[in-house]
């Protein structure tokens, strides 16, 4: 199953992309493309494009901001009028928590901008959910 990655104000893109591709291949996911956004508007545009042909999109970065640029703030504003089936925190003992949102058959996974942390999340609390989704598709 194909998926896409959107890096949002991420600093460790090449390291994260390599770790993410490796983790996702183990879950039966193939990264179709990777895109980049530096602000909330660009993130929105990239997500619309990504969801136009993939049902699973991963965003990396933006979790460490404490202002309106925070991906948590941007996504809260974006989905406030959308009914989500699942909105779950992906606990990460090694740093920033990730998040998973599902609306219908589309899934957005928000991950920290750190290869070790995203690897821990994808091999930990997100693994069973994503594996089950891929198998059911």
List PLM regions with ranges.
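Proline/glycine-rich low-complexity loops and linkers
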Residues: 46-48, 52-59, 63-136
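Glycine-rich phosphate/diphosphate-binding loop of Rossmann-like nucleotide-binding domains
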Residues: 1-39
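Structural motif
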Residues: 37-48
């Amino acid at each position: 199953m194909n998926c896409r990655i959107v890096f949002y104000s991420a600093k460790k893109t090449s390291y994260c992309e390599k770790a993410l591709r490796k983790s996702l291949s183990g879950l039966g996911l193939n990264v179709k493309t990777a895109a980049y956004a530096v602000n909330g508007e660009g993130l929105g545009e990239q997500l619309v494009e990504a969801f136009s042909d993939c049902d699973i999109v991963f965003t990396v970065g933006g979790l460490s901001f404490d202002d309106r640029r925070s991906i948590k703030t941007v996504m809260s504003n974006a989905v406030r009028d959308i009914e989500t089936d699942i909105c779950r925190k992906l606990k990460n003992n090694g740093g920033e928590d990730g998040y998973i949102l599902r609306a219908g058959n589309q899934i957005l996974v928000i991950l920290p901008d750190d290869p070790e942390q995203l690897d821990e999340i994808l091999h930990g609390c997100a693994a069973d959910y994503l594996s089950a989704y891929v198998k059911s598709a």
